[in-house]
């Protein structure tokens, strides 16, 4: 995969009109887009279907979690939409149900381990007695056992997650901040170059591109930073 196949731009905007303008601005530079709750509830599912039909790859970030049958039914319908990736929380029974429902569809299911906006204090407040690092590795192992296609985790855990899940699973990393950019509300962040060197296979970049004065230039800067990490001489 080249950098263009690995960069996922998060369409973190409130309206379809804004998303359409952004996709038009970025043009052929960007192949892969993430669509989450904000846009889904503004009519984003139909927009996602249209983008996929136009040749773009879509990462539908729904973070599903429910009883097995409900998760399976949702995954079956999403698989028919031509999506490339779908997230669900990394709970074993839900993951197993999703894997069975997606079989043969080409949909890559991603287990969400610990949100990159969370740290140990946040987990403790939510009732977890594990630190983020330990919980990520535990859930990564459960995702592999369930037959998931990949993991969502911070780049800080990518190298150890790779040891847990083996060579074939995708490691999708949010919380990516290009060199010199603001961290925003993310607590576990890394640059594109460092994330790829750490073992991430796909990088999700939202606000540093979407909110940039010149999104196309910002996207190209990220791609260039990624190329630097992927170039054989830098391996």
UniProtKB/Swiss-Prot annotation:
GO molecular function, one term: orotidine-5'-phosphate decarboxylase activity
Function field: Catalyzes the decarboxylation of orotidine 5'-monophosphate (OMP) to uridine 5'-monophosphate (UMP).
Protein name as it appears in the record: Orotidine 5'-phosphate decarboxylase
Keywords from the named record: Decarboxylase, Lyase, Pyrimidine biosynthesis
SMART domains according to UniProt: OMPdecase (SM00934)
GO terms for biological process, alphabetical: 'de novo' pyrimidine nucleobase biosynthetic process; 'de novo' UMP biosynthetic process
Residues at the catalytic site: 63 (proton donor)
Subunit and partners: Homodimer.
Alphabetized InterPro entries for the sequence: Aldolase_TIM (IPR013785), OMPdecase (IPR014732), OMPdecase_AS (IPR018089), OMPdecase_bac (IPR047596), OMPdeCOase_dom (IPR001754), RibuloseP-bd_barrel (IPR011060)
Catalysed conversion reaction: orotidine 5'-phosphate + H(+) = UMP + CO2
Superkingdom field: Bacteria
Gene field: pyrF
Keyword Lyase: yes
């Amino acid at each position: 995969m080249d950098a263009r196949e690995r960069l996922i731009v998060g369409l973190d905007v409130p309206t379809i009109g804004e998303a359409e303008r952004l996709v038009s601005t970025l043009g052929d530079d960007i192949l892969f887009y993430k669509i989450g709750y904000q846009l889904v509830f503004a009519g984003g599912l139909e927009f996602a279907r249209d983008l996929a039909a136009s040749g773009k790859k879509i990462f539908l970030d729904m973070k599903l979690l429910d009883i097995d049958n409900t998760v399976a039914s949702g995954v079956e319908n999403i698989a028919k939409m031509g999506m490339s990736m779908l997230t669900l929380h990394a709970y074993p029974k839900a993951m197993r149900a999703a894997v069975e429902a997606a079989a043969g569809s080409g949909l890559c299911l991603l287990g969400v381990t610990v949100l990159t906006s969370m740290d140990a204090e946040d987990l403790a407040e939510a009732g977890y007695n594990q630190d983020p690092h330990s919980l990520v590795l535990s859930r990564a192992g459960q995702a592999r056992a369930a037959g998931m296609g990949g993991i969502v985790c911070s780049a800080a855990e990518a190298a150890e997650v790779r040891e847990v899940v083996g060579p074939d699973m995708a490691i999708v990393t949010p919380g990516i901040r290009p060199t010199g950019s603001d961290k925003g509300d993310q607590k576990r962040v890394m640059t594109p170059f460092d994330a790829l060197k750490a073992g991430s296979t796909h990088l999700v970049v939202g606000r540093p591109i979407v909110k940039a004065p010149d999104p196309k230039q910002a996207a190209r800067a990220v791609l260039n930073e990624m190329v630097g990490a992927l170039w054989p001489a830098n391996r």
